[in-house]
Amino acid sequence: MAQLEVGAVQDWIISTSLAQSENGSSETSNEALPLETYETMDSPETNTGTWFNLTGKRQQGEYTVTYGQLFHYDIRTAQLTALTSWSSPNPDRPLMWQQITGSLTPELLIDHSIGLEPHLQAYQVALRGTPDLSLISLTKAVSRDPEASNALKLANVGLWSLAADRLKFIKTNSENWSNSAQAQLDLIAYHAKSIQNQARQSFANAHQQVLVKLMDGQWREALKVLENDPVMQADVRESFKTETSRLWKRLSVAIEDDPSHSTLQAWTAMVMLDRDGPARTKTWLAKQGNSGDRTRALEMLAPELLPPKPKPEPKPNLKLEPKVEDKPIEPLDPTSPKAKPNGEKSPLAIPTSRPY
């Protein structure tokens, strides 16, 4: 019988997984974590031996993280192979087989997703003899096109749809599109589909609806939700203060990639206002030039960043005498001295009689 000495899983694999999922930082250590449970796993194909995990659980902050070591046992050769260590904050299905590329064998996915943030680590599997796992890395672009590197920058901050669209465009204009480049595109497109499905959902909370669209880089669509909800416009900045870190990591990369996008400028300024204060934000806005679309967006997102509207000049309070023709005509008193010059009485005041 094959035997293999199994070591403990290091604590850093959990911390790194959570940091990647949240796109933030997390403290790491070299603490050894025990493997306590044996769990079998479905095989990607028939007659490929037995796949199983030795697993454990650990509380990391607010998350209960499942961690483990993946093994393969070849029945024909009685060979036992340790493949990879892993961790996942999703205890129900931390590992799965899923066809995401055009390869005959499905990929092994490790789910690092947290909340609304999809994040899956993918391995391509070669089953010739001892299984070989090859990570689909999104650290460095395979394509030599400079725009491919920019696409991966977008993907690594969670702007999956923008990254997928960029790579698809590069592919249509590329004469040497490799299988490795296609694997990167397939993995990014898989994430994009996941977050797009979330963005299409109807949320009871309008703030969450806007948040998901912003997470997917749908700048104009997020603004349209606000346009249809005047109540939300009044507190949009306040409601997103807890999401500053999540939004800023996307906005800062997106605005560098597309600096002339007026709606994106407005969202960037709104978050920058809370991060850096009004003075620095106004200075940054001034460097972007004028834009009517951005002004209309800022009226909803951060009106305090707009220059004050000029006050209308007060109308002069002049009391105009009515024109002569507008004065009412006073009835003439025949007995009045004014009726005839020099105070003479008008003949009309002398009674006359006519003989009959």
Predicted feature residues:
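Glutamate identity and glutamate-enriched acidic tracts
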Residues: 5, 22, 27, 31, ...
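Terminal, low-structured helical/coil segments at or just beyond the last alpha-helical repeat
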Residues: 260-356
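Alpha-helical protein-protein interaction scaffolds
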Residues: 145-304
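Long, contiguous interaction/recruitment modules in multidomain scaffold/adaptor proteins
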Residues: 2-182
